[in-house]
């Protein structure tokens, strides 16, 4: 049973990484800026992975836009999600959010990448880990823009991943560095932060969801990423979500309250995650591969494997064909202009 997504150290594939990626527990990998030099190099790295690892791997990346864009040189400058609401008219916002979703997904698919973990559905801009990655502080605006972005992704042939369930936007702490606590009442969370997830699930827009490494203290003592309450009771039963549940990176400090890397992995799977991310912790990956035992006899095995298969890219796009497409060319300039305008607005605020 393949459940783990791991990372690569550098810009070329090492033999040890071929062996790790070939392990039966490994379902795929996630690429980072450290793996990228230019488009030709990243395409060659991906080609090497596909050729040397003799099984289908889900290749993923965080190419959200704005400050979370792992590949920049030679790619569209994608706007921060907040930029749509702050720089465009109401009609333009939805139109260009859709184009951004399409542009991002088409470029990644043309590299032979299956999935970019997007969009961010967190409300508000106060959390330093989220900031302008969020579309809006307003539920209706966030849902409208996220719907358009996802429609663009789907049109290009990429599955969507809503994050960070049930909402990371109201904590100031960064879960990369510590475990944040959200002490608001269940009613506050359900009437606000949960709404983008709930509404997009009801519209059948979300193919996958990534929970937060945040403890919602009035609801459960575990981070959402390791919480049966959030993943089984709320996400699966109450919201009737049928798609894939990814853990956020189990190497993050925010996951530390769940124990060592093997314990974190077991807790996340038992809580309801289908696929686990473990990054920047090579020894941790080896520990998990040596000690995590998953078999076809375990509950939900077939459902989890079917969900994994649903995430692979749904079409093939040739890079040269893409960049000669008029839609891509128009978007390339317009989306960069939106981000430039947004950066100017931020710079003026800081002056």
UniProtKB/Swiss-Prot annotation:
Q: What Pfam families does this protein's entry cite?
A: Glyco_hydro_3
Name the positions where substrate binds: 62, 70, 133, 163-164
Subcellular location per UniProt equals:
Cytoplasm
Tree of life domain: Bacteria
Q: Where do the catalytic residues lie?
A: 176, 248
| Residues at the site labelled Important for catalytic activity | 174
What does the entry give for GO biological process? Answer: carbohydrate metabolic process; cell division; cell wall organization; peptidoglycan biosynthetic process; peptidoglycan turnover; regulation of cell shape
Keywords (alphabetical) are: Cell cycle, Cell division, Cell shape, Cell wall biogenesis/degradation, Cytoplasm, Glycosidase, Hydrolase, Peptidoglycan synthesis
Q: What is its EC number?
A: 3.2.1.52
Its Gene Ontology cellular component terms are: cytosol
The protein's annotated catalytic reaction(s) are: Hydrolysis of terminal non-reducing N-acetyl-D-hexosamine residues in N-acetyl-beta-D-hexosaminides
Subunit info here reads: Monomer.
Q: Briefly, what is this protein's role? A: Plays a role in peptidoglycan recycling by cleaving the terminal beta-1,4-linked N-acetylglucosamine (GlcNAc) from peptide-linked peptidoglycan fragments, giving rise to free GlcNAc, anhydro-N-acetylmuramic acid and anhydro-N-acetylmuramic acid-linked peptides.
Q: What protein is this chain from?
A: Beta-hexosaminidase
Q: What is the originating organism of this protein?
A: Haemophilus influenzae (strain ATCC 51907 / DSM 11121 / KW20 / Rd)
């Amino acid at each position: 049973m393949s459940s783990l997504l791991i990372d690569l150290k550098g810009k070329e594939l090492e033999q040890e990484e071929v062996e790790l990626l070939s392990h039966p527990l490994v379902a795929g990998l996630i690429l980072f800026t450290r793996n990228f030099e230019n488009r030709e190099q990243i395409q060659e790295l991906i080609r090497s992975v596909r050729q040397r690892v003799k099984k289908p791997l889900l290749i993923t990346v965080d190419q959200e836009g704005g400050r979370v864009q792992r590949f920049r040189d030679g790619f569209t400058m994608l706007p921060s999600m907040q930029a749509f609401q702050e720089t465009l008219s109401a009609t333009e916002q939805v139109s260009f959010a859709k184009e951004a979703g399409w542009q991002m997904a088409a470029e990644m698919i043309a590299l032979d990448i299956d999935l970019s973990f997007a969009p961010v559905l967190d409300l508000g801009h106060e959390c330093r880990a989220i900031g302008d990655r969020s579309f809006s502080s307003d539920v209706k605006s966030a849902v409208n823009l996220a719907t358009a972005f996802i429609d663009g992704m789907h049109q290009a042939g990429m599955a969507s991943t809503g994050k960070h369930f049930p909402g990371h936007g109201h904590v100031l702490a960064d879960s990369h560095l510590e475990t944040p606590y959200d002490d608001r009442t269940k009613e506050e969370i359900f009437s606000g932060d949960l709404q983008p997830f709930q509404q997009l699930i009801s519209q059948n827009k979300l193919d996958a969801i990534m929970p937060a490494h945040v403890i919602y203290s009035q609801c459960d003592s575990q981070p959402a990423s390791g919480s049966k309450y959030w993943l089984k009771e709320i996400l699966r039963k109450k919201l009737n979500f049928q798609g894939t549940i990814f853990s956020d990176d189990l190497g993050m400090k925010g996951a530390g309250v769940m124990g060592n890397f093997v314990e974190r992995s077991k807790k996340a799977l038992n809580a309801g995650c289908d696929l686990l991310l473990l990054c920047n912790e090579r020894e941790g990956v080896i520990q998990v591969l040596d000690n995590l035992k998953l078999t076809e006899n375990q509950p939900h095995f077939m459902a989890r494997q079917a969900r994994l298969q649903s995430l692979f890219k749904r079409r093939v796009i040739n890079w040269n064909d893409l960049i000669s497409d008029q839609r891509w060319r128009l978007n390339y300039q317009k989306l960069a202009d939106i981000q430039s305008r947004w950066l100017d607005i931020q710079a003026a605020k800081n002056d």
